[in-house]
Amino acid sequence: MSNLEHEAERVEMAAATTEIRQRVLELRQLVQRASYAYYVLDAPILEDVVYDQLYRELQDLETQYPELLTPDSPTQRVGEQPATQFVSVQHRIPLYSLENAFAVADMQAWQDRWQRQGQAIGEQSATLRSPEYVCELKIDGSALALTYENGVLVRGATRGDGVYGEDITANVRTIRSIPLRLDWPDPPPIVEVRGEAFLPLDVFHRLNQEREQAGESLFANPRNAAAGTLRQLDARIVAKRRLDFFAYTLHLPLASARSATQPAAAQQLDLLAVAQSDPAVAAQQLDLSSASQAESVTTHLPQTQWQSLELLQQIGFRVNPHRQLCPTLADVRQYYDHWNHGRLDLPYMTDGVVVKLNSLRLQEHLGFTQKFPRWAIAWKYEPEQAVTEVLNISVNVGRTGALTPVAELRPVQLAGTTVSRATLHNRDRLAELDLHIGDKVVIHKAGEIIPEILQVFPELRPADARPYQLPTHCPECGQPVVQPVDEAVTRCLNVSCPAIVRGAIVHWVGRDAMDIDGVGEKLVRQLVDRGLVNSVADLYRLTVAQLLTLERMGNKLAEKVVAAIAKSQSRPWSRVLYGLGIRHVGSVNAQVLTTAFPSVERLMAASAEDIEAVHGIGPEIAQSIVQWFQTPANHSLIEQLSAAGVQLAQDTVAVPPSQLPQPLAGKTFVLTGTLPTLSRDEARSMIGQAGGKVTDSVSKKTDFLVVGADAGSKLDKAGQLGIPCLSESQLLELLEET
């Protein structure tokens, strides 16, 4: 072939490549536009068959020419490989929670507070007298923080504790109403969008039907289903569940937010906030790379929350269509009343109304408390109630032998779900209600999750209604039950009780204990009912042949179960101790105890005084441990576990409690609110183990206040005294650093 022919071929190939590149870009634009119209605007512009043809053509070209594949392509929403874990990430701008209101008086008090704050900072009285509010539905889902760099989605994270969340980008990319690339020419270098991921009701009901047919446990409500879906390690499962997303907040992080090692208040880090006071400084802080970017960003910045929502919609997001501008608090009340009655007609769950001051300038001036923005509030719906009839009262027996009475109800719709059971807690609650079988009762969902009986109508009690008394014998094993002194709980003390055995094994195989994959409640029930397992030690004697006698058990699955059980033999001593299910010994306490007593022999030989000497371990825990090891059946269990090869010691040398590291020695802590992952006892134990002291009230002697959700007056007092506040993650960091 001549040089001329070579050159002609090269030119022809280059032309073909250019043509293909152009076609790929064209297909991406078509598919993205069609997806936006379908998933965001709910106004399809292409027939499904045409969309599928275009999508497949794009997919084929990207496979044939992998150099043309980019992360923002619509074909890249779902990855092929499941993740192994989620990584903790710090939010550039914190995700604040909202203050809650439950009545008109709460809303009026909130308005009075922000108006007083406005007067204190010199805000014009006309602005304070005539505010404008934006009302939005409070979607009952999971909050997400999305980060875009140069217009491309690079990170999706959960809310977490508001400072740290989990990176779930692969899962976020599967949500079709979240754009992979913003429809924003010359966007700012970094754009952050906050919103709510949720499961539409029709998808939720279909998902539960599929789970029921597969013999899997049902999701309690769409919120739990959405949260559980987002935490799936396999994005392919997430994609199948068809989550949706509404955006409600736009942030344009300044350079200071991108370089900060500790999060600051949102108004100090966001261009939209800073620009309300000094647009020139804000544009300078953005580090814009071109004049066109500067003009595009700084000349079209929203001045109001309403404009922010409109901009979010313009750049590709779905924004809730039921938002409304309200000139007065009276208009806000009308909006609330409308949706309080009309919420069940929506195709998704809501749990209230979010009310925000419309002016971004006023938002910036009012700022934040340590927990909430002063310029926004969540007006929660009243818990939905319903009247129904008690058909029967049954009793559940837990792993500790506790008998919990449960009311069996005539099925009724409550907060969007069918309710047929309600907990009665214990003997004292039964006595307080004076409940009879046949009574008409009012039920509600505590926190709109757990059904419980709120009120009994004795005047409507039928003549044949029967009073109820807790059984004197265990309904599972028939042995007499006891009422421990100073406890409202009635207990079965038979360690061979099937319910206690099942509960103990389910606890043992759980994620925080031995983490035995493939062994769930249904399999445990079969194993106990068939007499194959009577204690956790029996798990380690199971064979494939025995498992094959169970329902829905094939050879491959049986081999996996046996392998998973064998793998658990190497779990550390701290997990074993927690897995034993000793009352009051949580996972954190177990770690503390196994540090002080690095073998089961050392712990068995310890007195209550020895155990109580460990920082963070109180007399109740110490006595519970001593009593557990004094029981002959538990001695036998330890011997069987040892023979099975389970780790009952750790390699470290025992350290006397008095010589354990005490990095927080001399520091006094107070706990308030609900922490994301730790219980109060676990946090108290960790602080005590490190030498710190936890007290119940805030004073000048308090060094740190550890703050969780729904913190109370302790937070206000700490603010008045200038006491530093820590989130759970900051407490854990402090413990790790020291």
Curated annotation (Swiss-Prot):
GO cellular component assignments: cytosol
Active site: K138 (n6-amp-lysine intermediate)
Keywords recorded for this protein, A-Z: DNA damage, DNA repair, DNA replication, Ligase, Magnesium, Manganese, Metal-binding, NAD, Zinc
SUPFAM superfamilies, A to Z: BRCT domain, DNA ligase/mRNA capping enzyme, catalytic domain, Nucleic acid-binding proteins, RuvA domain 2-like
Known cofactor(s): Mg(2+); Mn(2+)
Keyword Zinc: yes
Domain BRCT: 659-738
Alphabetized InterPro entries for the sequence: BRCT_dom, BRCT_dom_sf, DisA/LigA_HHH, DNA_ligase, DNA_ligase_AS, DNA_ligase_CS, DNAligase_adenylation, DNAligase_N
Chain positions recorded as Zn(2+) binding sites: C474, C477, C492, C497
MF GO annotations: DNA binding; DNA ligase (NAD+) activity; metal ion binding
Pfam families registered for this protein in UniProt: BRCT, DNA_ligase_aden, DNA_ligase_OB, DNA_ligase_ZBD, HHH_2, HHH_5, Nlig-Ia
EC supergroup of this enzyme: ligase
Top-level taxonomic group: Bacteria
EC number: 6.5.1.2
GO biological process, alphabetically ordered: DNA repair; DNA replication
Family: Belongs to the NAD-dependent DNA ligase family. LigA subfamily.
Function noted in UniProt: DNA ligase that catalyzes the formation of phosphodiester linkages between 5'-phosphoryl and 3'-hydroxyl groups in double-stranded DNA using NAD as a coenzyme and as the energy source for the reaction. It is essential for DNA replication and repair of damaged DNA.
Stated name of the protein: DNA ligase
Chain's gene name: ligA
